[in-house]
Amino acid sequence: MADTIQVTPQMLRSTANDIQANMEQAMGIAKGYLANQENVMNPATWSGTGVVASHMTATEITNELNKVLTGGTRLAEGLVQAAALMEGHEADSQTAFQALFGASHGS
């Protein structure tokens, strides 16, 4: 017999919260990196092809992080919506069951 995983609305909401928290942490790390990058790229401190390459890397990190944040936000919002739908369907099913068989059978 295969093991099953029961997914609850609370599990979906908890996962959405974890995604948001991890994205905030990633954003903090990236902002720190980019701030350091801007400090290092000061022309008085550093110049040449290394600055250009480093700037391109920082720009790419920013672009990719924005994609991750957009996707992660959509995912988290979708999980919260799915949790609400699950609860709505469960309530509708319970009401339909009780209407069909009586209130004493559903509890």
UniProtKB/Swiss-Prot annotation:
One of its GO terms (cellular component) is extracellular region. Disulfide bonds: none annotated. Pfam families: WXG100 (PF06013). The keyword Secreted applies. InterPro entries: ESAT-6-like_sf (IPR036689), T7SS_ESAT-6-like (IPR010310). Keywords: Secreted. It is found in: Secreted. It comes from the Bacteria. Its main location: secreted. Belongs to the WXG100 family. CFP-10 subfamily. This is ESAT-6-like protein EsxD. It comes from Mycobacterium tuberculosis (strain ATCC 25618 / H37Rv).
